[in-house]
From Swiss-Prot:
Oligomeric form and interacting partners: Part of the 50S ribosomal subunit.
A single MF term (Gene Ontology): rRNA binding
HAMAP family in alphabetical order: Ribosomal_uL15 (MF_01341)
Gene it is expressed from: rplO
SUPFAM superfamilies the UniProt entry points to: Ribosomal proteins L15p and L18e (SSF52080)
Organismal lineage: Bacteria, Bacillati, Bacillota, Bacilli, Lactobacillales
InterPro entries: Ribosomal_uL15, Ribosomal_uL15/eL18, Ribosomal_uL15/eL18_sf, Ribosomal_uL15_bac-type, Ribosomal_uL15_CS
Stated name of the protein: Large ribosomal subunit protein uL15
Length: 144
């Protein structure tokens, strides 16, 4: 066997059949779809169930979006251990430390994890357990 005698495996290089490109090709005009009817047309729209009432219309609408909702950026106690002992933790300091991407409507401190440092924390909201843990560690909480 020589390099110039190499041939692809039988059936591995099948030419794609281009339909709807003239009658003489054997697959022109109706392009192998037969005559009229649903199967001769293009696809049905998304969510179409053959004329039966589709699922998205059978299920009732629920709820609404409250335009006055304030979304807080949440920070757990365990994340505050990156600050030095006696430091003042402000929203700007949290953004600078990379703990929070953006402040949104403010920052809420949650009580998940342990706090091992004495910190003065300034935030929009505190959970009860977070406030207790900060004060138990000798720190202070301040609502801004």
């Amino acid at each position: 066997m020589k390099l110039n005698e190499l041939k692809p495996a039988e059936g591995s290089r099948k030419v794609r059949n281009r339909v709807g490109r003239g009658d003489s090709s054997g697959n022109g005009k109706t392009a192998g779809r037969g005559q009229k009817g649903q199967k001769a047309r293009s696809k049905t729209r998304l969510g179409f169930e053959g004329g039966q009432m589709p699922l998205y219309r059978r299920i009732p609408k629920r709820g609404f979006t409250n335009i006055n909702r304030k979304e807080f950026a949440v920070v757990n106690l365990s994340a505050l251990n990156v600050f030095d002992d006696g430091a003042e933790v402000t929203p700007a300091a949290l953004v600078e430390a990379g703990i929070v991407k953006n402040e949104k409507a403010g920052i809420k401190i949650l009580g998940n994890g342990e706090l091992s440092k004495k910190l003065t924390v300034k935030a929009a909201k505190f959970s009860k357990s977070a406030a207790e843990a900060i004060e138990a560690a000798g720190g202070k909480t301040e609502v801004i």
